[in-house]
From Swiss-Prot:
The complex is composed of two ATP-binding proteins (MetN), two transmembrane proteins (MetI) and a solute-binding protein (MetQ). This is Methionine import ATP-binding protein MetN 2. Belongs to the ABC transporter superfamily. Methionine importer (TC 3.A.1.24) family. CDD domains: ABC_MetN_methionine_transporter. The gene is metN2. The keyword Cell division does not apply.
Length: 396
């Protein structure tokens, strides 16, 4: 895909559409057109089948998705799940075998070559590998699509300068790609993707080749571009950290199917599919191995021995929207089950303004003797008044 979009042939076909002068990014906020009702991108029962050496292979199966205008929509899944195929359907590099893909209400599958060129002029593309021309400067790399499209030199210069300011590379205008860091190269790629003032920006694993610190800076840039320009971003990744940092909504793709979708806070706080839970495993506060090895399961109606600590798994999903009152939680547990209540593991995070996470709490039962089912039930009832979900892990 990168080679096709960056090839001279692709740029020349794009240039076949008459050039329309565009405002510089700095003025886009004030001059942005009124929002158009409906989704920016919609997939309606989309299937895609490729011919393979062993026969037909389904890459996508009955995918139905709406991507809201002006948002940042993340698509996540394992390698080979079908994420990049979704992206290729949006810009017409692939045609669906069944169903329809619509961009701003236009069925991409019905467009002829000229229609596809016009569509791609309104879609920016950011790649995992930067695909910069080594013999051209930063400014020349950014301005090349405009030059081929016949944009006058003075206008090209104004547009390139505005984009360099937008991505924080004004001082690198005359530098060559060999002198740039990975993050700087990706900033050039982002600026180049914005030269035609696209309404939609597609990002295909745009940070997977970068170190963690640089990744965060690129994600911050994408979020800033989304806010300042109001364009829709569709972002493909296999990293949940990327989704958490920048996306409003996420779809989880597994073996060609969308198995879960929703606001990022909901999918992270209350994952409903096994594939989602597997992808989130690196972000979940699992019990340390030494503590997990000591946990003993409850034995039906048998009381816990004197001196045991009841372990409660307390979850905040963000559904309530408020701030958790940890003081009230521990006080309620102390009143109902024991003299000493303390946190042994976990942590809380804030996603889209909602607090969520996991806390493992130990309630010591020594002072009141053995604890039977009634006291354990009281502990659960007390904790559930202050959290979204509470379960007993066992005791130590």
């Amino acid at each position: 895909m990168a080679q096709l979009l960056d090839s001279p042939g692709f740029i020349e076909r794009s240039a076949a559409v008459p050039h329309k002068a565009a405002a510089a990014p700095a003025t886009r906020d004030a001059a942005a057109p009124a929002a158009v009702p409906g989704a920016a991108v919609s997939f309606e029962l989309v299937g895609k089948v490729f011919d393979g050496p062993r026969g037909p292979a389904a890459a996508l199966r009955e995918v139905t998705l709406d991507i809201a205008r002006g948002g940042v929509f993340g698509v996540i899944g394992r390698s080979g799940a079908g994420k990049s195929t979704l992206l290729r359907l949006v810009n017409g590099l692939e045609r669906p075998t069944s169903g329809a893909v619509r961009v701003n209400g236009v069925d991409v599958g019905t467009l002829d070559e000229r229609g596809l060129v016009a569509l791609r002029r309104r879609i920016g593309m950011v790649f995992q590998h930067f695909n910069l021309l080594s013999a051209k400067t930063v400014a020349q790399n950014i301005g090349l699509p405009l030059k081929i499209a016949g944009v006058p030199k003075a206008e090209r210069a104004r547009k390139v300068d505005a984009l360099l300011d937008l991505v924080g590379l004004a001082a690198k205008r005359d530098a060559y790609p060999a002198s740039l860091s990975g993050g700087q190269k990706q900033r050039v790629g982002i600026a180049r993707a914005l030269v035609h003032d696209p309404a939609l920006l597609l990002c295909d694993e745009a940070t997977s080749a970068l170190d963690p610190e640089t990744t965060q800076s690129i994600l911050a840039l994408l979020a800033d571009i989304n806010r300042r320009l109001g364009l829709t971003i569709m972002l493909i990744t296999h990293e949940m950290e990327v989704i958490r940092a920048v996306c409003d909504t996420v779809a989880v793709v597994e073996q060609g199917e969308v198995v879960e979708t929703g606001p990022v806070w909901r999918v992270f706080g209350d994952p409903r599919h096994g594939a989602t839970r597997a992808l989130l495993r690196t972000l979940v506060h699992d019990l340390p191995a030494d503590l997990a090895a000591r946990v003993r399961p409850l034995d039906g109606a048998a009381p816990l021995p004197c001196g045991a600590q009841l372990l409660l798994d307390v979850r905040y999903t963000g559904a309530s929207g408020g701030e958790p009152d940890l003081g009230a939680l521990t006080a309620a547990l102390a009143r109902n089950v024991g003299d000493a209540v303390h946190f042994v593991h976990g942590g809380l995070d804030r996603i889209q303004g909602r607090v969520q996470g996991r806390l493992v709490i130990a309630a010591s039962l020594a002072a009141r003797g053995a604890a039977g089912p009634d006291r354990i039930a009281a502990a659960l009832a007390a904790a559930r008044r202050h959290a979204n979900r509470v379960e007993v892990l066992g005791y130590v």
